[in-house]
């Protein structure tokens, strides 16, 4: 009878611990990693025809990935853009904003409504199947990265308040 109790206790403990959620890696690149280079082509004639991340070495870069269907990433992108442009036009940070909307028209309407003024705002119409999405191992939550002048990630998922503090 004692063995049955011990077996029951062991089974109970093992079943309880199996329901505890383990820490999962958060995916994407991390602070200290070198940002993966990419090229993105814009469909708008008003913007640069191609943006190449490696050409921005020597500048600090705020790299923001978002989509209009993801309210949190959209709001974060707009607040980062506003924080960047309201602090000082001569700051040393350039923003590269990449949307994963599958339709150019939705992207353009979102940019207009959110009043994003960055000339380096691009859309990747392949969405989650794009090379950039895969290179950066992005998930549904999207993310942003602050890169130093050598392309090394110095902050991940930075808020507008943190960006403003950095710029001041």
Kindly give the residue locations of the regions a language model identified:
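Structural microenvironment flanking redox-active thiols in thiol-disulfide oxidoreductases
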Residues: 74-114, 128-132
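N-terminal targeting signals for export/organelle localization
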Residues: 1-39, 165
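A short beta-strand-turn-helix
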Residues: 39-61
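Thiol-/selenol-based redox modules, centered on thioredoxin-like
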Residues: 140-168
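Hydrophobic beta-strand anchors of alpha/beta hydrolase catalytic cores
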Residues: 62-63, 95, 144
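Aromatic-flanked redox-active Cys/Sec active sites in thiol-based oxidoreductases
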Residues: 64-70
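Short, internal strand/loop/helix patches
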Residues: 108-145, 149
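Residue-level signal for well-ordered, solvent-exposed loop/turn and beta-edge residues enriched
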Residues: 33, 46-48, 152
